Amino acid sequence: MTSSSMTIAALATAPAAGAVGILRLSGPEALDVGRLLAPGVPAQPTPRHAYLASFVDAEGRSLDEGLFLYFRGPQSFTGEDVVELQAHGSPRLLRLLLTRALEDARVRHAAPGEFTRRAFLNGRLDLTRAEAVADLVAADSEAAVRAAAAGLSGALASRVQALEEPLRALHADMEGVLSFPDEAEGADEDVGERVTALRAQAETLLAEVGRGRLVRRGARVALFGPVNAGKSTLFNRLVGEARALVDDEPGTTRDALEARVEWDGLAVTLFDTAGLRETPGRVEALGIARTRALLTGVDLAVLVLPPGVTQAEVEAWTRDVGGTPVLVVDGKCDVAEVSSSPRQRVSGLTGEGVDALRDDMLGRLWGGGTPSAVALVSERHADALRRASEALGRAESASRVSTLEVVSGEVGLALEALGEVSGTVVSEALLDAIFQRFCIGK
């Protein structure tokens, strides 16, 4: 029996004390081995039926009493026979049960992500859904949970399929013309138009990468600006607690402070940075240097200004951020005179304008979209989509100046790249790279 067809076993719950712990087996011997641990279960148990059973050691002594569940393949998560033993969540007890299962020569320990990998290989999940399992396990915000759940239900798969199927049909039409030119006359008349439309679809999906990245790792937002502009007070107000020291003396904040918040389901790491000024002390200058380095790596920089700042000064402050998007606000509006400035006015002290500022920041981060519309397009997906789009761009150009054979070749390359997203074209090395990020037992 090959390693890939052996029965595998692993703990499906975290190795920590809890109310319930689960031992999972999948493969041709899952039921036999499961019944060695729970001999009171019938030889032909009813699939998807929970049996109250005694779990025993090799000498038949009871270790625990729990639930035994059998899922007959192919109607199971992995597409194989699956058995789950749900015991009390003692790490030592669960380790004893796992060790007992692994003592059987027909069983080996599952590799990271191997249960989900078998589900993919057995056609139970496409690759985007399989990756969504890992996204859901790793999700640490409401937006990440909802986006991963949408991926698991096929949101990304359906969009990839909507691009892949007409692309495959186009490729088949062109290959038909090339192979049987007399019988397929006229089948290639609209090739250029079809390629252009499909490239636009690929670009639309590729545009989701930035927002998908936000959902996966959370957003990074930095407050910056001149000293005594009210940044630290505003930071404390946005965080909801007094994290930053507030004082009228310039240079109070020397190291960037950070706090994690969740706004409308999106995880946001907020930074309060050292105030910028022309003649700081030596230690303060180090903080300012760190601020400038930080500003180039965040998703949004919020420039907080004191009263009376001119537009020329605003432009001078924004030179520090590189290509980072900047939102400019007037701080300390509670002490400033009402002005005709179009900038947003906020006060960290009173809370005036803070809710509107938070909404504006979220709007900038989402790029005008909504969290519910985010497709979890990963960096791996982005690389494949980028190659597909580039191939379609070359096909579009070739449709005007070159032969149908060249166009068909480029469309074929685009199909191969898309296949890496859906899983229709995938290597063992790629599968290894994808499933290694899963935890064992998933």
UniProtKB/Swiss-Prot annotation:
Single GO BP term: tRNA wobble uridine modification
Subunit structure: Homodimer. Heterotetramer of two MnmE and two MnmG subunits.
Binding site for GTP: 228-233, 247-253, 272-275
EC top class, as a word: hydrolase
Keyword Cytoplasm belongs to the record: yes
Protein name: tRNA modification GTPase MnmE
Entry keyword set: Cytoplasm, GTP-binding, Hydrolase, Magnesium, Metal-binding, Nucleotide-binding, Potassium, tRNA processing
One Gene Ontology CC term in the entry: cytosol
PROSITE patterns: G_TRME
Enzyme Commission number(s) from the entry: 3.6.-.-
Binding site for (6S)-5-formyl-5,6,7,8-tetrahydrofolate: R24, E84, R124, K442
Positions contributing to Mg(2+) binding: S232, T253
Job description of the protein: Exhibits a very high intrinsic GTPase hydrolysis rate. Involved in the addition of a carboxymethylaminomethyl (cmnm) group at the wobble position (U34) of certain tRNAs, forming tRNA-cmnm(5)s(2)U34.
Protein family: Belongs to the TRAFAC class TrmE-Era-EngA-EngB-Septin-like GTPase superfamily. TrmE GTPase family.
Subcellular locations according to the entry: Cytoplasm
Superkingdom as given in the UniProt entry: Bacteria
Cofactor: how and how many bound: Binds 1 potassium ion per subunit.
Domain TrmE-type G residue range list: 218-366
Cofactor(s) in the UniProt record: K(+)
Main subcellular location of this protein, as a coarse class: cytoplasm
Gene3D superfamilies membership: P-loop containing nucleotide triphosphate hydrolases, Probable tRNA modification gtpase trme, domain 1, tRNA modification GTPase MnmE domain 2
Molecular function terms from GO: GTP binding; GTPase activity; metal ion binding
